[in-house]
Regions:
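An anionic, glycine-rich sequence signature occurring as long contiguous blocks
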Residues: 63-166
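Phosphate-centric recognition/catalysis
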Residues: 172
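Gly/Ala-rich phosphate-binding loop of Rossmann-like dinucleotide-binding domains
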Residues: 57
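A short acidic (Asp/Glu
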Residues: 51-54, 76-78
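Alpha-helix boundary/capping residues
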Residues: 34, 165-168
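Conserved, well-structured functional cores that handle cations and Mg-NTP chemistry
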Residues: 1-52, 60
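Residue-level signal for helical boundary/lining positions with a hydrophobic bias
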Residues: 40, 168-169
C-alpha cells in the first residue's frame, strides 16, 4: 500500500524521497491491486474521466460516483441545463446540525440523461443543493453540485446517492 507523505506525492521505492504525481495518471495503478469489486469509488471532477469510469466498471467491477464540473464542459452543461430546467420536488432531503451550522441537503436524481450523455456507464445523473446557515453569524449560503454515478435505479435510490456524495468528503 502506498502512503503519500503529502498530497500530490508518492514515495519512491526503497527511498525517503518523494516524486510528484498526476492524479489522473496514478489513479488506475494505485487501485490495480486493491479488491474494489462491488465498492463505490468517489472522485472529484479531476478524475471524472471516461477511461477511468470504463476501467472501474469493466475491469474492477466497481461503481463510480463522480463530481462533474467545467473540466468536462459538455457533460457539465448538459447536466446543469437539465436540472436547472427540472421543476420538481427534491427526491430526498437531509438536515444536519453539526460544526456550528445547520445544513440542509437536497438531491434530485434522474435516469433521463443516461443515453444522452456522452459518458460510459451512467446509471443516474444528479444535482445536490446545500443550504447552509452559520448558527453564530446567521450567514446563509447556497451551493450546488452536479454529478454522475454508475449505480442504476435497482442499485441506488436518492438517499443512497446523497450518502455516497457526502461520504466522499469524509476523507478530506
Amino acid at each position: 500500500m502506498l502512503y503519500p507523505k503529502k498530497v500530490g506525492t508518492l514515495p519512491v521505492e526503497n527511498s525517503d524521497q518523494e516524486k510528484q504525481t498526476n492524479e489522473i495518471k496514478i489513479a488506475i495503478p494505485l487501485l490495480t491491486n486493491i479488491d474494489i469489486q462491488g465498492k463505490t469509488i468517489t472522485a472529484d471532477a479531476l478524475l471524472t474521466q471516461r477511461h477511468f469510469a470504463t476501467w472501474l466498471v469493466e475491469q474492477k467491477k466497481a461503481h463510480f460516483h463522480f463530481t462533474v464540473k467545467g473540466n468536462q464542459k459538455g457533460l457539465f452543461d448538459d447536466i446543469t441545463y437539465f436540472f436547472d430546467n427540472h421543476n420538481q420536488k427534491p427526491d430526498h432531503t437531509t438536515i444536519d446540525y453539526d460544526h456550528g451550522r445547520i445544513e440542509e441537503r437536497q438531491i434530485w436524481i434522474s435516469t433521463d440523461l443516461n443515453q444522452y450523455l456522452s459518458f460510459p456507464y451512467v446509471g443516474h445523473a444528479f444535482m445536490v443543493r446545500r443550504n447552509i446557515i452559520d448558527k453564530k453569524s446567521g450567514k446563509k449560503r447556497e451551493d450546488f453540485a452536479y454529478g454522475i454515478t454508475s449505480k442504476t435505479p435497482d442499485e441506488a435510490d436518492a438517499a443512497t446517492i446523497l450518502q455516497d456524495n457526502r461520504g466522499h468528503w469524509c476523507i478530506e
